[in-house]
Amino acid sequence: MMIKLIVNADDFGLTEGTNYGIIDGHINGLVNSTTMMMNMPGTEHAVRLAKEYNLLGVGVHLVLTAGEPLLKDVPSLVGENGSFHKQSVVREGNINPEEVEREWTAQIEKFLSYGLTPTHLDSHHHVHGLPILHDVLERLAAKYNVPIRRCEEDRAVHPFSDVFYSDFYADGVTEDYFVKLKERVQGEQTVEIMVHPAYIDPELVKRSSYVMDRVKELRILTESELPEGIELVKF
């Protein structure tokens, strides 16, 4: 009875320090998958690394709550400064799903334009779990033939795992996290764990409030070994 594990590093492309942390977590640790942000300062750098380290599965980290959109004509998605709304505003639901679909399509198409093949889709701040965007995700999953990160909601769209854990984060980043994993998972399930390893650079400090713990995550991801009965799998 093997538990199949995907350790996905979010925020590939956020900054160069983030990118190097993810690659280090892949080469020397448990990270076997990542998702790329297409509208960030480190995106081009992430593309180069993705091609260099092609054993790392790379999907698209759909963005709606950080940086600026790729498209100009998406008024419901941006504030007066032209940047995406904060997460709290998006969660109020005053966004136009049609604009989200166009913007997310542009993000996926930009990923494809680099000659990369996406393994799956997920989203920054997990906004793809919003009920208002359910139909958008169904169409994108079908159009690009990719699975999507499981949401806590019952209406998960084409999920690729039986279980999704987002608690390896902040206070949940513990030395024994992976050792205790077996106690939490039943039988032959596929499990995804979301992680955020990084090396700190000035751009990360500017763009994220989650900084120091990323370095701790990276250390634990590179020092931990999986218990018997758990194997890393790719999509």
Curated annotation (Swiss-Prot):
InterPro entries xref list: COD_ChbG_bac (IPR022948), Glyco_hydro/deAcase_b/a-brl (IPR011330), YdjC-like (IPR006879)
Enzyme class: hydrolase
This protein's record includes keyword Zinc: no
Ligand binding (Mg(2+)): H61, H124
One annotated GO molecular function: hydrolase activity, acting on carbon-nitrogen (but not peptide) bonds, in linear amides
Keyword field contains Metal-binding: yes
Source organism superkingdom: Bacteria
Keywords associated with the record: Carbohydrate metabolism, Hydrolase, Magnesium, Metal-binding
CDD domains: YdjC_EF3048_like (cd10803)
Needed cofactors: Mg(2+)
GO biological process assignments: polysaccharide catabolic process
Enzyme Commission number(s): 3.5.1.-
Function as written in the Swiss-Prot or TrEMBL entry: Probably catalyzes the deacetylation of acetylated carbohydrates an important step in the degradation of oligosaccharides.
Family: Belongs to the YdjC deacetylase family.
Protein's recorded name: Carbohydrate deacetylase
Protein source organism: Bacillus cereus (strain ATCC 14579 / DSM 31 / CCUG 7414 / JCM 2152 / NBRC 15305 / NCIMB 9373 / NCTC 2599 / NRRL B-3711)
